[in-house]
Amino acid sequence: MPIDSQDAPRPLPDRPNLRHLKDQARALVKAGEAATLSAAQFQLARLYGFTSWPKLKAHVDSLEASMREAAELKQAIDTNALGRVKALMTRNPELHRAPLGYGENGPLTWVAECRVPWEAPTAARLEMAQWMIDNGSDVHQGGDGPLMRAALVDSRIPMMELLLQNGANVNAEWNGYFPIIFAPCETLEPGALKWLLDHGANPNCGKAGRKYPDSALDYVIGTYSRSTNLGACIDTLLEAGCGSRRNMPVVVDLLRGRMDLLARHLDGDPMLIQKKFLELDFGSTAARRLTLRGATLLHVAAEYGNLEAAKMLVERGADINAAADLDEAGVGGQTPIFHAATQFYDWGLPVVEFLVERGADLSVAAKLPGHYERPDEFVDCSPLGYARLFPGKESKTVEFLREAGAAE
């Protein structure tokens, strides 16, 4: 490890370890870059911006002690041990700002999420949250992280109420880019969504230049979650006057599960059955980047596991094997079954079974977007091959496709 005294100080690792630093010092001696262990330790101290090894050691010892205390605090929270939480945080008030919870916002965020144990907030958990706020925890930590995490699940509304009573802001933007109202939109929790709206949350919260610039309605349409609650969430936002940049009534009514309105659209314009919608820039889920751009209404029904809509569309002449449009790079061309077969928790299996029963081609191949964490990845595969990749586990859907004779 060559050390140049002209270099700017190097930051310590996120979780510095004294043993690792000692090993680094020994490696310097072994490599001939320091004459003695003391000299090597001094070089390391200077490398990390300290004037001496004892000062570096004291700093790392302090950090390690803080991490141990934070781990103890998390264990106390997870077991709802209020007395232990009080003792730890009273002894060390800095624990109110310990890197716990989503985005390391703080212990209050972790308490509010009620993730461990996964349950509705108990009286003990609510008392814990109130004690933390009364004794130094910031209800706005991370941009109202506690309220954002509580709003992910309907059963946490009592926690949301407590946070609001203590000054939480329903119109805050977590981390500067995620409006609190987007939390129940992401997880499709209509109760928490309505609670936020009833308490002043603005659904028309679009902001140009933000990471997520759209309204709450646009966000709920684009979420990766799949649930029978989708229609209720859309209806709640429409009733609240939420707008959308998307002008596609037939698609929205399909997503709402309004078969009466879908039928009315199709009666008024039978060509909608075969239309390919270039504006559908949503539909990704199960870790894949594939969206519905250039796809048909049957693709939409397949993506959202809407068996009733799929049956209506096929009965009215929808092509089971309609291929979505290709982009300029030749990516796309997937048939509806690709969407139904690649869902978390076999959400699309009933639609897969229906499409196969009606003659879906299981040998068709397409070049499609890969994993969302690998933006340059594209894969050439069949419906079964895509289902094996996304969400990436053996499933009842994969088993069914194999039994149906699908090509790998």
Where does each model-flagged region fall?
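Extended repeat-based scaffolds of very large eukaryotic assembly and lipid-transport proteins
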Residues: 61-121, 126-128, 135-136, 256-260, ...
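Residues within HEAT/ARM-like alpha-solenoid scaffolds
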Residues: 102-103, 120-127, 154, 158, ...
